[in-house]
Amino acid sequence: MESEQRRKRKRIYKPDSTSNSFFSVRSLTACLSFFVFLLFISSDRSPIKTVSFRPVLNVPVSLLPTPLGLTRDSFDTKSLPLIVEDRVLLPDHVLLIVSNKVATSQNLDCVYSNLYNSHDVVLKPALSVNQYHRDKSIVRCQLPPNNYSAAVYLRWSWEAAEGVAAAAPASVVSWDRVVYEAMLDWNTVAVFVKGLNLRPHKESDSSKFRCHFGLSKFDKDEGIVFTTEAITAAQEVIRCLLPRSIRNNPVKAQGIRVTVSRINAGEDGVDAPLPSVAKVYGAKSYEKRSNRGKYELCACTMLWNQASFLHEWITYHAWLGVQRWFIYDNNSDDGIQEVVDELNLQNYNVTRHSWPWIKAQEAGFSHCALRARSECKWLGFFDVDEFFYLPRHRGQDMLGENSLRTLVANYSDSSTYAEIRTICHSFGPSGLTSAPSQGVTVGYTCRLQAPERHKSIVRPELLDTTLLNVVHHFKLKEGYRYLNVPESTAVVNHYKYQVWDTFKAKFFRRVSTYVANWQEDQNQGSKDRAPGLGTVAIEPPDWRLRFCEVWDTGLKDFVLANFADTASGYLPWERSPF
């Protein structure tokens, strides 16, 4: 009898031995991972990267074999597994970060699991796919149906339905509270954070923050390997020192995940680290041009669905002397990559950077300033509906090519000025009801009399380490100041109030962190809004006649004189009817 009871007790406790074995294996795996991580950062040979090692062999391309007809360009990325690293729940879609390149959203499905029955799934086509951080991709999926999880995963439409519900449980983080980007900056890292709710346009106390580095997602503090102090904090950017063990060789930080925690007056004094989808990356441009001369003048902009304006904006400003372009694309779906490719074929130096984070323009400009610093002496921040104009002086001919570059180059060695500011004139629809075929510079010629705001061109290496900015101008290093350029020397034509079909897109979403969306009943007196409009995109009957106080054809005349084809009269960005 007693022996029978002992056998039963053994059977009852058998699962516990399995559980103990599981935790032992888990602990062993964690220890081995930690050991490998330490080995990587202590080695002088093996920086952590997301790309594999490729030894350099100088062999003529024509002599290289191509087994099975595969090349880098012809390789079918659809044959690679769809490994989702992170998921972020945004207000209007779910963002997935995929560990490899995905060429197209065609035949790519987002898979949603029922919250109460994992075998009940719904498939919806992916909204879009973009390259992200070199060899990764971002995939956008629709919001989940009611009672379905936002922890979306992916599959190709031709894959067998069997096993779709067998995916492991996955996590999803909210856009309201997440570390979303991190950029290496010498022996520090600039960490971009949503949810700290720091004061806008002001520096905050950095002593209240810490950065944590590791290989995992920091679930329950399990992934933290190193912790360092923050040295600056402003708006959505926390700058921290790199861990001491890799400070002398910052490249080893590439690919390490980072998060931020806040020190408070709570019970334990420290908040839990924020969820993070951010891994440390360096500026790709720094690797390319660290030993070469810098461009004199570059431009950075953030846009959404404005590909149709790019050709005119870039062609015109390239003539004025802009040499390098950084386009931060905020979830466009209007074929912008094709436009960028076409411009590069015409020898314009344009890079499109996917910036999927909504309401994060200031952070995006801080990111761009870091990225461009090693390439550019001067960096202009202005929108694709804003055009610099250098009016001719009385008794003088029109200024020639590269005139804007020449203007800023006069101050490249200044020990005083690190920013050049120009005022803006806001133009209205100018009586038009449809978009002008010759572009905005020729089509819109009536504006408000009083100037508004200003736009800036800065020296990136002389920006304050906080990277604090108010959309179009930055806090400068101590000892430097800005220069206001007289209106007679340079001005920006801002084609702000265009024909209604173009203008109404502004109601969808404003990109600035600290500017309310126009559908919201907030700050209706703000200069960001159009006077007289409410919160609904309804065209006023007299829209085409509004914002017209001064007829100004200065830039129109300049463009027609310098850009129009002498035979046909067509402008370079104008679509020929033939």
UniProtKB/Swiss-Prot annotation:
GO terms for molecular function: glycosyltransferase activity. This is Glycosyltransferase family 92 protein RCOM_0530710. The keyword 4Fe-4S does not apply. It comes from Ricinus communis (Castor bean). Its main location: membrane. Pfam families: Glyco_transf_92. Belongs to the glycosyltransferase 92 family. One of its GO terms (cellular component) is membrane. GO terms for biological process: glycosylation. It is a single-pass membrane protein. The chain crosses the membrane at residues 21-43. It is found in: Membrane. Residues 295-531 form the GT92 domain. It is an enzyme of class 2 (transferase). Keywords: Glycosyltransferase, Membrane, Transferase, Transmembrane, Transmembrane helix. InterPro entries: Glyco_transf_92. Its EC number is 2.4.1.-.
